[in-house]
């Protein structure tokens, strides 16, 4: 065996390498892959050296027709493949041509998931090189439909399913996962999937999709990523009655049973993977999301993308839009439709940044921000009946029953939708915004597209082309009065991959609000005048890896500044360091 394990760096045998976790975008491979450059030979290890038919069935090492003649001979592949030798670039062109033949987005999603299951590097090569085209396929809005139909399209397990049946043995379940050095976990309980509600165990599509973006956009190694679904039941009657439903067929656990089960999950995660594993809470219902973040944000490297990631990306859009609107954050007035995780999270980060800029207490800067929920404007007279996370936004004002009246009374310069209620920004609402603003900033953030508060065409048309618009789901360019408007997408994918990479490369042990502000500032700086000329307040996704490297560097710098980083000494050039740590999907040559 030792004869096959050749020295790969500085004359050191791979058997003598220190098996510590790397500081880069993944876990350390003791058998050479993490140390090898793209032109060096690596050994395709699984439990043993993969060869023959098993190598073709191993998605991490399979290259399909790109195995050259020498590799086919050395790894017993002769006869198992047609004789032609392809390149990765040719494979990419062929697959993109095939995917473009599908008319139904869900078919494209399934084609991409099939590719991920058989050829991991080619999957990420496609996604990185065609990110603007494929991002809506592998994530929002298509992933929402995929989750709704997950039971029917389920083929091969991806990630860990931890249900109430595993109570008392969660550590054992975690140890069943084949990778030991996990750096990023995305976990959901499926109760609030996008704007689609309780999808129970079928919410697994969200962690899987998110982690594919951590790799493609942020450069975190796939083997360092772990998607997890916590199955505590579902209250979705259609799923409970569906014979194809893949989860527990019982109503959701709540209260003490739920909190104890989550505690039993969080403790062994830290025990098994260490203090520096990032745990991203995803699509938990409001009543649990805030409690979990408050409880575990001080004891774990925990992050809620719906609360913190959304807030960071929206703040970045607002900060960049100020170059079009003029003034500072404190010069503007904000009105939200939706006072859940996203709405209150965005509002709090805006208030925090405003407080930082003006040196005013956050209690004062919050007064520039108003929220509307299902019962109307959140005001002081409602304070006793409000959930705890809404109370900071209960300002003194007469009751206002609906959004239109709130716009007329508050006269905001920025209107933000995070309600999950499609078409909530009516013509009257947007016209009211246009009547009191030369350039109203309208952010319709709810996903998927069907739940968006308004479309790009509606925003531009009803404001006579004066709106600055961005949305949570993608919209096509709009022609109005001979001018083409390109709507921006306030997609969390701008933030969380770079944020995660920044936490990984710095070895951070906690997520601090200052890191979220640092991520926002880095993203806002990437918007160019050319982008503004097209009406964009976010940079194009085609540059996402460069954007993520700058975000990672800014986040890591803040971690070092706050004393929360453990990877010492601090690299001199954090941007270059982040880029060097990013996973490359280019095929490796096998010895």
Curated annotation (Swiss-Prot):
Alphabetically ordered keywords of this record: Cytoplasm, Metal-binding, NADP, Oxidoreductase
- What are the record's GO terms for cellular component? cytoplasm
Q: In which residues is NAD(+) bound?
A: 192, 306, 447
Instruction: Detail which positions bind a divalent metal cation.
Output: 282-283, 306
Q: What domain of life is recorded for the organism? A: Eukaryota
- Record-linked Pfam families: malic (PF00390), Malic_M (PF03949)
**Family stated for the protein in its record:** Belongs to the malic enzymes family.
Q: Specify the protein name.
A: NADP-dependent malic enzyme
Which species does the entry assign this protein to?
Answer: Vitis vinifera (Grape)
The record lists the lineage as: Eukaryota, Viridiplantae, Streptophyta, Embryophyta, Tracheophyta
């Amino acid at each position: 065996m030792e004869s096959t394990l050749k020295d790969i760096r500085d004359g050191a045998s791979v058997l003598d390498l220190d098996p510590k976790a790397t500081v880069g975008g993944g876990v350390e491979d003791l058998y050479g892959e993490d140390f090898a450059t793209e032109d060096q030979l690596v050994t395709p290890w699984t439990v043993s050296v993969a060869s023959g038919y098993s190598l073709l069935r191993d998605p991490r090492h399979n290259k399909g027709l790109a195995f050259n003649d020498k590799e086919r001979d050395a790894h017993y592949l002769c006869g198992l493949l047609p004789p032609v030798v392809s390149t990765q670039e040719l494979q990419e062109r062929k697959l993109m041509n095939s995917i473009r033949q599908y008319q139904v987005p869900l078919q494209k999603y399934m084609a991409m998931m099939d590719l991920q299951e058989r050829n991991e590097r080619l999957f990420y090569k496609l996604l990185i090189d065609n990110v603007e085209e494929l991002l809506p396929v592998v994530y929002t809005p298509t992933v929402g439909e995929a989750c709704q139909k997950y039971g029917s399209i389920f083929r091969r397990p991806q990630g860990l399913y931890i249900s109430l049946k595993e109570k008392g043995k969660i550590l054992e379940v975690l140890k069943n996962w084949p990778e030991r050095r996990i750096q990023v976990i995305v976990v959901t309980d499926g109760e609030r999937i996008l704007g689609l509600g309780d999808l129970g165990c079928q919410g697994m599509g969200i962690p899987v999709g998110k982690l594919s973006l951590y790799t493609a956009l942020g450069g975190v190694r796939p083997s360092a990523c772990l998607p997890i679904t916590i199955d505590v039941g579902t209250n979705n009657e259609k799923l409970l009655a569906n014979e194809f439903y893949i989860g527990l067929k019982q109503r959701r656990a709540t209260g003490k049973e739920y909190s104890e089960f989550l505690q039993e999950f969080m403790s062994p995660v830290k025990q098994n993977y260490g203090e520096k594993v990032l745990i991203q809470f995803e699509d938990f219902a409001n009543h649990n999301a805030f409690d979990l973040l408050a409880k575990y944000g001080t004891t774990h490297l925990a992050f809620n993308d719906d609360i913190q990631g959304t807030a960071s990306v929206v703040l970045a859009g607002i900060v960049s839009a100020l170059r079009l609107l003029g003034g500072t954050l404190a010069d503007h007035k904000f009105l939200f439709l939706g006072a859940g995780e996203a709405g209150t999270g965005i509002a709090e980060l805006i208030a925090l940044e405003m407080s930082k800029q003006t040196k005013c207490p956050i209690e004062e800067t919050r007064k520039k921000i108003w929220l509307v929920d299902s019962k109307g404007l959140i005001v002081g007279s409602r304070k006793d009946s409000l959930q705890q996370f809404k109370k900071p936004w209960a300002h003194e004002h007469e009751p206002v029953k609906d959004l239109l009246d709130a716009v007329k009374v508050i006269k905001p310069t920025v209107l933000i939708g995070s309600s999950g209620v499609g078409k909530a920004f009516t013509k009257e609402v947007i016209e009211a915004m246009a009547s009191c603003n030369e350039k109203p900033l309208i952010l319709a953030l709810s996903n998927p597209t069907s739940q968006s508060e308004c479309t790009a065409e509606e925003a531009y048309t009803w404001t006579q082309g004066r709106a600055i618009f961005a949305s949570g789901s993608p919209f096509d360019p709009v022609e109005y009065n001979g001018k083409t408007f390109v709507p921006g997408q306030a997609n969390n994918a701008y933030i969380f991959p770079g944020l995660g990479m920044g936490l990984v490369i710095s070895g951070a042990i906690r997520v601090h609000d200052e890191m979220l502000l640092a991520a926002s500032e880095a993203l806002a700086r990437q918007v160019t005048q050319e982008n503004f000329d097209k009406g964009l307040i976010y940079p194009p996704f085609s540059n996402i890896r460069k954007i993520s490297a700058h975000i990672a560097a800014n986040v890591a710098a803040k971690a070092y500044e706050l004393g929360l980083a453990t990877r010492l000494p601090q690299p001199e050039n954090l941007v270059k360091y982040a880029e060097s740590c990013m996973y490359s999907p280019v095929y490796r040559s096998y010895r």
